[in-house]
Protein backbone atom coordinates (compact mmCIF):
# COMPACT_ATOMS: atom_id res chain seq x y z
CA UNK A 1 0.00 0.00 0.00
CA UNK A 2 2.86 2.37 0.82
CA UNK A 3 4.33 1.82 -2.65
CA UNK A 4 0.98 2.59 -4.27
CA UNK A 5 0.71 5.83 -2.28
CA UNK A 6 4.13 7.02 -3.40
CA UNK A 7 3.44 6.03 -7.01
CA UNK A 8 0.15 7.94 -6.89
CA UNK A 9 1.93 10.99 -5.51
CA UNK A 10 4.42 11.02 -8.37
CA UNK A 11 1.59 10.81 -10.91
CA UNK A 12 -0.12 13.79 -9.30
CA UNK A 13 3.15 15.74 -9.17
CA UNK A 14 3.69 15.06 -12.86
CA UNK A 15 0.22 16.12 -13.91
CA UNK A 16 -0.50 19.08 -11.67
CA UNK A 17 0.48 22.70 -12.30
CA UNK A 18 2.66 24.08 -9.50
CA UNK A 19 -0.05 26.33 -8.06
CA UNK A 20 -2.19 23.28 -7.26
CA UNK A 21 0.50 21.10 -5.70
CA UNK A 22 -0.09 22.30 -2.13
CA UNK A 23 -3.75 21.38 -2.29
CA UNK A 24 -3.06 18.01 -3.91
CA UNK A 25 -0.36 17.14 -1.40
CA UNK A 26 -2.77 17.95 1.42
CA UNK A 27 -5.20 15.39 0.01
CA UNK A 28 -2.62 12.59 0.09
CA UNK A 29 -2.46 10.39 3.20
CA UNK A 30 0.94 11.57 4.42
CA UNK A 31 2.04 12.71 7.88
CA UNK A 32 3.16 16.32 8.29
CA UNK A 33 6.85 15.36 8.19
CA UNK A 34 6.47 13.85 4.71
CA UNK A 35 4.58 16.91 3.49
CA UNK A 36 7.46 19.05 4.77
CA UNK A 37 9.93 16.88 2.83
CA UNK A 38 7.99 17.21 -0.41
CA UNK A 39 7.57 20.96 -0.03
CA UNK A 40 11.27 21.39 0.69
CA UNK A 41 12.16 19.37 -2.41
CA UNK A 42 9.68 21.34 -4.50
CA UNK A 43 11.17 24.59 -3.28
CA UNK A 44 14.66 23.31 -4.14
CA UNK A 45 13.76 22.07 -7.61
CA UNK A 46 11.12 24.61 -8.61
CA UNK A 47 12.55 27.65 -6.80
CA UNK A 48 11.00 30.17 -9.20
CA UNK A 49 7.57 28.52 -9.11
CA UNK A 50 7.10 27.55 -5.47
CA UNK A 51 7.98 30.54 -3.32
CA UNK A 52 4.82 30.48 -1.24
CA UNK A 53 3.25 28.50 1.55
CA UNK A 54 0.03 26.91 0.25
CA UNK A 55 -2.87 28.27 2.30
CA UNK A 56 -4.25 24.79 2.91
CA UNK A 57 -0.98 23.69 4.52
CA UNK A 58 -0.42 26.71 6.77
CA UNK A 59 -1.71 24.82 9.82
CA UNK A 60 0.73 21.97 9.08
CA UNK A 61 3.75 24.05 8.11
CA UNK A 62 3.88 27.55 9.66
CA UNK A 63 7.02 28.48 7.68
CA UNK A 64 9.03 26.92 4.92
CA UNK A 65 11.96 25.14 6.56
CA UNK A 66 15.28 26.90 6.13
CA UNK A 67 17.02 23.54 6.22
CA UNK A 68 15.73 20.24 4.95
CA UNK A 69 13.90 17.98 7.40
CA UNK A 70 15.23 14.41 7.57
CA UNK A 71 14.61 12.80 4.18
CA UNK A 72 13.75 9.18 3.55
CA UNK A 73 15.37 7.25 0.72
CA UNK A 74 11.97 6.97 -0.93
CA UNK A 75 11.50 10.74 -0.93
CA UNK A 76 14.99 11.25 -2.34
CA UNK A 77 14.33 8.76 -5.12
CA UNK A 78 11.16 10.64 -6.04
CA UNK A 79 13.27 13.81 -6.03
CA UNK A 80 15.36 12.20 -8.76
CA UNK A 81 12.20 11.94 -10.84
CA UNK A 82 11.31 15.58 -10.18
CA UNK A 83 14.83 16.61 -11.12
CA UNK A 84 14.69 14.69 -14.39
CA UNK A 85 11.43 16.47 -15.25
CA UNK A 86 12.90 19.89 -14.47
CA UNK A 87 16.36 19.35 -16.03
CA UNK A 88 15.70 21.16 -19.28
CA UNK A 89 14.72 24.41 -17.59
CA UNK A 90 17.42 24.49 -14.90
CA UNK A 91 20.92 25.88 -15.46
CA UNK A 92 23.33 22.95 -16.10
CA UNK A 93 25.43 23.79 -13.03
CA UNK A 94 22.40 23.68 -10.72
CA UNK A 95 21.19 20.42 -12.26
CA UNK A 96 24.62 18.81 -11.79
CA UNK A 97 24.83 20.02 -8.19
CA UNK A 98 21.36 18.76 -7.27
CA UNK A 99 21.98 15.45 -9.02
CA UNK A 100 25.29 14.90 -7.22
CA UNK A 101 23.68 15.75 -3.88
CA UNK A 102 20.82 13.32 -4.42
CA UNK A 103 23.20 10.59 -5.59
CA UNK A 104 25.28 11.02 -2.44
CA UNK A 105 22.22 10.90 -0.18
CA UNK A 106 20.84 7.78 -1.83
CA UNK A 107 24.33 6.22 -1.70
CA UNK A 108 24.27 5.22 -5.35
CA UNK A 109 21.14 3.13 -4.89
CA UNK A 110 20.12 1.77 -8.27
CA UNK A 111 16.83 2.91 -9.71
CA UNK A 112 16.72 -0.21 -11.89
CA UNK A 113 15.18 -2.26 -9.07
CA UNK A 114 12.56 0.42 -8.47
CA UNK A 115 9.13 1.19 -9.83
CA UNK A 116 9.58 2.37 -13.41
CA UNK A 117 7.14 5.19 -12.79
CA UNK A 118 7.96 6.65 -9.37
CA UNK A 119 11.40 5.09 -8.62
CA UNK A 120 10.30 3.74 -5.26
CA UNK A 121 11.94 0.37 -4.46
CA UNK A 122 9.55 -2.46 -5.28
Swiss-Prot record:
Keywords: Mitochondrion. The keyword Mitochondrion applies. GO terms for cellular component: mitochondrion. Its main location: mitochondrion. It is found in: Mitochondrion. The keyword Mitochondrion applies. It comes from the Eukaryota. This is Uncharacterized mitochondrial protein AtMg00680.
Amino acid sequence: MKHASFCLSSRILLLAPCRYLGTLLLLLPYPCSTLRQFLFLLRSLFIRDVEWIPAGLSHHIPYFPLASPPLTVETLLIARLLLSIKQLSLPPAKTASLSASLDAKTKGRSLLSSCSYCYMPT
